Structures are given as C-alpha cells and as structure tokens.
C-alpha cells in the first residue's frame, strides 16, 4: 500500500448549533455547543486512516492544551504524528462553526497552522517514497502550498489538491497537480459559472464535488459519479472525508471512477454523525464498495 502524506491544518473546532443564523447585529440563543478536533488536514488524515490508509500528518500545533488534544486524537486514529511540530510563538488553530438549516458556516483562525514552513515540508517530501500520495489544502501559508506543488511535481509524487478555503492561485499550478478537487462553489470562484468547459480542459484531473449529487470529472466525456442520499446531521468535514477516502482508493490502485464512488460513499456516511470527524466511517462499514 502506498504511503499517504497529509500536509495541512490541524485545529480545534468550536461548534454552535442553532435553528437559524443570526442577522447582522442580532443576538440569538443557540441550541448546543461542543468542541472537537478538526482542521481540513487533520480531518483528511483521520478519514484516510480510518479507511485503512497508511497516513502521516505534516503540520504544526501550539504548545497548549488544544495542541495536545489534536496530537492525541491523531494518535488514537493511528495517524503518524512524527512530522507535526509544536510551536511556542502562536496558539493552536481554531475553527468557529455554526450548524444551522442542514448546513454549516465556518470562520477559521489559522494560529499554528500558519507556522508550517517550506523547510519543514521539504525535509519530509525528500524522504517520501516515490509512489507516495500527498494531500494538501489551503489552510497553511500560500507560499508553502505552492512550494509543495512544485516539490511534488519535481519528485513525481501523486498529489490531491483540495482548494479549500478558496484563495487566488495561478492556474499554471493546476497543470502540476495530479488531482484537483474543488467543490461547486470553489470551482465557480476560480472559473465562473460555466465550468463544464474547464473540467474538459483538465481530463482525469479536475474532480468537482457536488454534495449529495456526487461528483463530476471528464474522461473522453463528462462522467457523473452519483452521490448517495443520507440522513444529514452535520455536513462539516464531508469534503475532507471525500479527499481522504479518494487518497485511500487511489493508494489501492482503484480506477478513478471507482475511487470517486468510494469517496462519495464515505462522504455520505460522514454527514450522519456530529462534528467533522464524528461520522467519518471505518473501512468495515464500506461493505458494498
């Protein structure tokens, strides 16, 4: 099995559940509050590990209680944390999440996630096996993201680039990644409303996720990989589950369409639990894929 490296954020999620979102200047009463581990990188690492991947996390946390919780959670989920650094000059990253109306909205405070450096990443990638898979997202500094893409391209490593949260990026970098996995909102921010032509321009590379409608990519023709309906409790982390699952499927040399179907299945299960990682499935429940 190929190694999976997740380079990215590891945070604590501070979650409020309410029946609606407040209007500007309004205070409302929430239904409940809880804290859980999160961050897109950490979520993707946990997703991949639970589904049977051999996963290493690369990132940074603060030297604080939150940082310790993040590390312990990764260890409990059998993720290698030897490349997660503890820094003293900034606190651990946090995400402030509102759950309402069967969806979520999130404000991210990067904290230690912005302490990830090109030097740290370069050391790790230089030691990676040539068939390793690298997952990255946009919750670490942009210069580090671009460095990772360039370095992986130089080393011939397989990359899954999940461009969330949205940042402006030169399109030349898309030619250097193996797989590019925006959701429908992100692809519209990058390319405008009519993005089907763009998908065709990146065959077997651009995979646009469409929530419960599944995902679409181009392979001689537009391929719609169906989603799976689920009883939604919390959509937080569904995209991260998808990307972690996609990496696992590819690490087992599944064909791309089958890998996306596997990832859709995992994402559909993830929304039935509370919290970004609460509903993430283990391999044994993925019996029909």
Predicted regions located by residue number:
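Glycine-rich phosphate/adenosyl-contacting loop at the front of the ribokinase-like
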Residues: 1-60, 65-69, 76, 232, ...
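Structural motif
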Residues: 3, 132-133, 179
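Conserved phosphate-binding/catalytic region of the ribokinase-like
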Residues: 4, 195-289
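Conserved N-terminal subdomain of the carbohydrate kinase-like
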Residues: 24-27, 35, 50-132, 287-289
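Gly/Ala-rich phosphate-binding loop of Rossmann-like dinucleotide-binding domains
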Residues: 49-50, 153, 251
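Glycine- and other small-residue-rich loops at beta-strand/loop junctions that grip anionic moieties
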Residues: 59, 136-138, 162
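Conserved phosphate/ATP/ADP-binding segment of small-molecule kinases
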Residues: 149, 155-226
